[in-house]
């Protein structure tokens, strides 16, 4: 075997990169030899914005050192939780069932107060033709234009209301929503839209928003679809599929060589829908996290 430099596959560790493609403008990302530190000093409680992404799956006896590193680089800025992420590859034809974790890593993580959970990252292979049948109007939401209360601002507000259905379908579920967190997330999307890195799409039925999603990208050819939400009364009508297809197709028109990804819980509806649209499993991202501090 040659002793020359190893050439990495272009898509190595692309699963974690997909999860970072839509980070907010106030999130700091720094690269080290064995990890990528993601920090959001203004929101130390934000899980996706305060995490240590490892460049390789850790051995059981390495976890404690990474937890210490998290404390030094992220916890010192106020994060009350610990979160480590790493990825393991999946075959494109891998089943939707969750991958099996390394039992020794899980045991050691538990001893450190961390729970390990999987997330499937899928990448677009070939976009399947639209299924049709969704009786909705699909429309991109314009970037904010600086006119509070104007038509564009009202469009953003209308799509934001749909976030309540992430928590559940009933008013009791909605009362548990963290409205401040949703407002902050939407404001970050608005800022990304202003600089051309986020496109929100809405599905309208009789002029009313019944579905929405966000497609964000990093300006370097990697895009991620997030926050696909459909009103409970309008589900199982092909709206989510229609939204996904339109958003991805539109992005590929602007950047034909883009890699488009989506993260979903293994075997979930989002996982199965992505596969039907032509996205294929790429990696399992393992998330080892502690409970939030009281």
Each language-model region and where it sits:
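N-terminal charged segments
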Residues: 1-77, 81, 90-102
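A short helix-loop-beta-strand connector motif used in the catalytic cores of GNAT acetyltransferases and
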Residues: 22-28, 78-80, 117-118, 190-202, ...
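Conserved beta-hairpin
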Residues: 29-33, 97-115, 197-213
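Conserved beta-strand in the GNAT
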Residues: 34-40, 117-119, 200-202, 208-217, ...
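A conserved beta-turn-beta hairpin within the catalytic core of GNAT-like acetyltransferases
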Residues: 44-52, 217-226, 235
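Acyl-donor-binding surface of acyltransferase catalytic domains
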Residues: 56, 62-161, 261, 268-270, ...
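Flexible, substrate/cofactor-facing loop regions flanked by secondary structure
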Residues: 134-223
């Amino acid at each position: 075997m040659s002793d020359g430099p190893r050439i990495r596959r272009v898509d190595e560790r692309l699963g974690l990169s997909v999860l970072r493609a839509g980070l907010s403008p106030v999130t700091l990302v720094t690269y080290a030899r064995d990890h990528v530190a993601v920090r959001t000093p203004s929101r130390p409680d934000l899980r996706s914005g305060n995490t240590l992404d490892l460049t390789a799956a850790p051995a059981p006896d390495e976890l404690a050192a990474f937890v210490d590193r998290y404390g030094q680089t992220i916890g010192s800025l106020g994060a009350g939780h610990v979160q480590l992420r790493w990825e393991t590859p999946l075959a494109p034809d891998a089943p939707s069932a969750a991958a099996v974790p390394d039992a020794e890593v899980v045991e050691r993580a538990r001893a450190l107060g961390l729970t390990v959970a999987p997330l499937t990252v899928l990448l677009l292979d070939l976009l399947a033709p639209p299924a049709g049948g969704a009786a909705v109007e699909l429309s991109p939401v314009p970037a904010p234009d600086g006119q509070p209360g104007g038509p564009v601002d009202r469009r953003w507000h209308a799509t934001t209301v749909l976030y309540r259905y992430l928590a559940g379908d009933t008013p009791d579920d909605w009362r548990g929503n963290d409205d401040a967190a949703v407002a902050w997330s939407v404001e970050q999307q608005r800022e990304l839209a202003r600089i051309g890195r986020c496109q929100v799409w809405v599905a309208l039925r009789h002029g009313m928003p019944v579905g929405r999603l966000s497609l964000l990208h990093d300006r370097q050819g990697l895009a991620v679809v997030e926050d696909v939400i459909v009103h409970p009364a309008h589900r199982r009508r092909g709206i989510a599929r229609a939204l996904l297809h339109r958003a991805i197709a539109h992005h590929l028109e602007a950047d034909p060589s883009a890699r488009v990804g989506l993260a979903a819980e293994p075997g979930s509806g989002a996982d199965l829908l992505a596969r039907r649209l032509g996205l294929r499993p790429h990696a399992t991202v393992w998330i080892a996290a502690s409970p939030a501090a009281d």
